[in-house]
C-alpha cells in the first residue's frame, strides 16, 4: 500500500496529511498567529519553523519514523505552467527562494516536500512533487487584457482547491466537471474566485497582487491613484505597501485580527464595527463571483439559453463558518445551486496527484524555469 505525505503551507496555517493510497489516515493543521513569523527574513525565513511544525505533527500522530513512497507539496509562485504534477528540482527551488514571481507561503511547499522526501523517504529515490500549482494558467485571451499594455493580467489563484472543489460539486450534481460551468470561490487568508468553463479556469482574480475582494489578510483591489499618493507622500514605502496589500490589509487592517472566529465572537458581544466588516467581506466576495458570469458564456458562441451556472461552489478555511457562508450564499442563490464544501479538498487532491504518479498514470514534468 502506497504511503503518501502531503504538505500545504498557507498564509495562516500549515496542513499535513498522510494517505494510504486513496484512504486518508490522518490530517493535522497548525495555525500560525499573525505575528508567528515576525522578525524572520521573508517567506523563506519561515522554512525551518514550518519544517519543525510538520515534524512535530508527524511525531505526535505516531509517524515520526514513517517511510513515505512520495511526498507532495503545494505548488508555489513560478512561471505560468500547465496543471498536473511537477518534480521538485533545484531550478524550481532557486526561483521560489528568489521570489522572482512573487512571495507567498505556498513557495515553501516544494522545499518542504523535498526535505521530507529525503528524511522520510522509503528509499533514496523517493520523489518530491507539486500538483496543480497556483500559477496554473488557462485564461481566455480576452481575460489577459487589462488597462495597461505593460501589465497583462496573470493567473495566480488557489488552483488546487478550486479545481478539487469544482470536481466534487460536479460529482454531486451527476455531471462531468469538463461538461459544466461553475463559479468557484476559495476563502482563506486570501480569497480567489474563478470561472470554470468546461474543465478550464478561464478567468480568475489574482488574489496575491491586489485583485478581487478584500480578505482576512489582503486588501484586494484598491483605488490606484490614492494608493500611489500614499507612497508618493511617504506615508508608506513601496515595501511597506506591498506587505500591507499581501499580508496586513483587509480584515486585519480594519479589526486587528485575521481570525474570522474572533470577528464573530466580537459580533456576538455587540461590536458593530466587526459586524460591518463581516458583512462587507461577504458582500464583496459575492460581488466578485457575480462579476465572472460573462466568462462562463464564452465569446458570442456556446451561449446557453438557461442561466449559465451549474453551481456556485464555496470552499476553503472560512467555509467552515456557517454564518459567513450563509451571508455569501444569500447573495448568490438567484444564480443557481450554491454548494458549500467546508472540508478542504486540497490535501486529497495533492494525494491523488501523487498516487497517479506512483501508479504510472502520470509522469511529473521537469521544471525549466520558463513559461510552460
From Swiss-Prot:
EC identifiers of the protein: 2.7.2.7
Subcellular location: Cytoplasm
Keywords: ATP-binding, Cytoplasm, Kinase, Nucleotide-binding, Transferase
An annotated GO BP: acetate metabolic process
Domain of life: Bacteria
Keyword field contains ATP-binding: yes
Reaction(s) this enzyme catalyzes, per UniProt: butanoate + ATP = butanoyl phosphate + ADP
Enzyme class: transferase
CDD domains: ASKHA_NBD_BK
Protein's name according to its UniProt entry: Probable butyrate kinase
